[in-house]
Amino acid sequence: MVGNIVTNPKLLEDTDKRYYRECYCGLCKSLQRKHKNISRFTLNYDMTFLIILLNEVYKEKNEKLECRCMMHPVHKHTYIKGTFIDYVADMNILLSYYNLLDDWQDDKNVFANCYAKLIKKSFKKVCKKYPKKAQNVQNALKELNDIETKNIINPDLAAQASGKLFGEIFAPYEDEYEEKLRDFGDALGKFIYILDACIDLEKDIKHKRFDRLKELVESQIAKNNSKYV
């Protein structure tokens, strides 16, 4: 359930584009510093959005730096360094690890399985640093998996579990902002789950996998047909 939150560059001012890129590059640098180069392949725009949100809510003052990297080896580019970038880098590892395991379970994706093993050490380090969050995320994913395993066709139940997961990630502290950030993450997580189901629908039908929308539609068709029997 990652890769759905992106920006539309055509609607951004130059200063906003620059800031977005600085947050994205800052996340990449934080992953490299905290979890080694291999972790940078987990980089995604969803987490960049979370950095921007938390920076705005907490009015975080970030340090702006310059560097070259393997993607930009010739010219230096700016990136930002700060508390929430490091927090989001850790959460990115947490979610990416579970997402890779999900890809392995659903598609038997060998690359996903191998990559999960490569970042497992970082995953354990994050779990040790944020035990409560790691446990809550695991609980939400277990709830989600149980719903899908039992073929429960009500998509709202699975969306609620997804909402719990995002709500946990979006609230870094137990403070005055926690409730609103958690509620925001919860609502966004529910939306993303349904969106993800729509995106995967054709593929799930082709491979005969469980899809909450496919099962719901088929159930409704069967129900309607029974009226005419």
Task: Write out the residue ranges for each language-model feature.
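Acidic catalytic motifs of isoprenoid enzymes
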Residues: 1-164, 168-183, 190, 194-229
